[in-house]
Amino acid sequence: MRSTLVLAGLLGTLVFGPAAQAADEHGDPATGRAFALQACTPCHVVSRRQVSPQRFAVAPSFDAIANAPTTTPSGLHAFLSTPHPTMPNLILSPEEQRDVIGYIMSLKRETQ
């Protein structure tokens, strides 16, 4: 009986674990958008309705980032975890990273 319970628990983890982890990896897009509107707008166009922050924006818009063919959640995580000379030394918590990544990925357009 005990081995049956252990096996059932392991199977549940295998079946439901990846789905829960995948949902957690992307965070909350609404929270990510709110954070990005406060922290990222000096250089990036964060929202599709936002006016460019500079006359000649140097940083790509979040829409352009989301729709670049090479953009993936893991790539965004690596980028946000690594300092870059053109970006301020913005340190995001793991939850903030997931939320911002969730927002960026929510901007990705469906391909036909």
Map each language-model feature to its residues:
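Short, solvent-exposed mixed-charge patches
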Residues: 110-112
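Extracytoplasmic electron-transfer domains, predominantly the class I c-type cytochrome c fold
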Residues: 56-106
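Bacterial N-terminal signal peptides
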Residues: 4-15
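Twin-arginine (Tat) signal peptide motif
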Residues: 1-4, 29
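The canonical Cys-X-X-Cys-His
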Residues: 32, 36-47, 100
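Detector for the c-type heme attachment site
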Residues: 43-49, 67, 81
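Electrostatic cytochrome c docking/interface patches
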Residues: 18-35, 50
